[in-house]
From Swiss-Prot:
Taxonomic lineage of the native organism: Bacteria, Pseudomonadati, Pseudomonadota, Gammaproteobacteria, Enterobacterales
One cellular component (GO) term of this entry: periplasmic space
Sequence intervals crossing the membrane: none
Localization (cell): Periplasm
The keyword Transferase is annotated on this UniProt entry: no
Alphabetized UniProt keyword annotations: Hydrolase, Metalloprotease, Periplasm, Protease, Signal, Zinc
Domain of life: Bacteria
Keyword Repeat among record annotations: no
Gene Ontology biological process terms, A to Z: proteolysis; response to hydrogen peroxide
InterPro entries linked to this entry: Metalloenz_LuxS/M16, Pept_M16_N, Peptidase_M16, Peptidase_M16_C
Entry protein name: Protein YhjJ
Signal peptide region: 1-24
More info: Has lost the active site residues.
Recorded GO MF terms: metal ion binding; metallopeptidase activity
Amino acid sequence: MQGTKIRLLAGGLLMMATAGYVQADALQPDPAWQQGTLSNGLQWQVLTTPQRPSDRVEIRLLVNTGSLAESTQQSGYSHAIPRIALTQSGGLDAAQARSLWQQGIDPKRPMPPVIVSYDTTLFNLSLPNNRNDLLKEALSYLANATGKLTITPETINHALQSQDMVATWPADTKEGWWRYRLKGSTLLGHDPADPLKQPVEAEKIKDFYQKWYTPDAMTLLVVGNVDARSVVDQINKTFGELKGKRETPAPVPTLSPLRAEAVSIMTDAVRQDRLSIMWDTPWQPIRESAALLRYWRADLAREALFWHVQQALSASNSKDIGLGFDCRVLYLRAQCAINIESPNDKLNSNLNLVARELAKVRDKGLPEEEFNALVAQKKLELQKLFAAYARADTDILMGQRMRSLQNQVVDIAPEQYQKLRQDFLNSLTVEMLNQDLRQQLSNDMALILLQPKGEPEFNMKALQAVWDQIMAPSTAAATTSVATDDVHPEVTDIPPAQ
């Protein structure tokens, strides 16, 4: 779903998610992914993985609708419809349906069977390998759930009395930071976790289902060691008979720009104070090579910054401080944060330490030896590209494809990725990287403090004063803001928070 991010694969080697955008001019899709569109508009994508014969077969059905499509009176419809679907047998007999769901969840990495968000509804199945019977049943079930659902007062009541297996993104839509981030956005008042309003009117839910659950708004993805021709034939037979066409475009979710202010938010999401130095920019799809190279440069600059600050803190023997970086795309906004984990009574001094290093990098740049070491490391990682690809299991491959879809990024072949990445690393200079660092560190930044509930509210004015005193614009610093497509979240070499 939105906002998800990928970290390092295979001992530090970034792989398929970034392998998404390479090729001079327009980027060409990876031919390993077979794809097509049925006559009713449903899109399908299949990746066969003979190199992973023992992996599970991953299936996702993405429906381009969520809670943002609801009016006030329709609140809860987008969550209720998949709940109804999960309590029906989907054209199978009851025993088959039970068996499908018992085997259709990966015990090692369980996913909710359905995730509803503001603009999407995602059905998830993970099947044992070499079970063509289950694959056929899964496709039949999904087609039935998304095109032939029985919606009556009885089926609604049955669903509401059953355990709610439908998850939302974000998982906690009422969490304090998320509510703060929604201010001024089109998403307010469209909570995907909202319950149905009483009295429940079955006909109106059915009308909503028929309006938004149309095949031309669906994308089916299959990844695994399967016979592609057989799977495509099955998709044609099973989904080709679905009816309906979108008459109304789906509303587009957007977030307002992040306000550059200092705020404290009480939340159950943290056990220790976490201060985020945060900035965001508009997100642009990546479909051509110039955007890819800008992204790579900005991403490498962020990684260099992370390691520089981390090493500076280690050299100063700083204790009681944890450092992390975090970048992601949230509804057309590319958001990055430098996260400081700190005891409450050391927040001011720890922010002072980090801000001084950031100002130093902004004004003087990175030392050339740090730049050379980072580029050498990246070249070494690139040599292990195909080994990492071989180790990427079907769950990872599917997750990366989903992120590329949602952020409108073109996936290309690993061979093309390797060539362009090599050319990029060979042509990069310390001056180019330092220019990017100046741009990013010259953004107006927000100070977002997450505090455990019950803790006294911190004096954010004092924290802002610490920041302003150190980070006041320097005459040596560039004043240009970061380019709009310099930030892409799911494909970062920055390691997770320590």
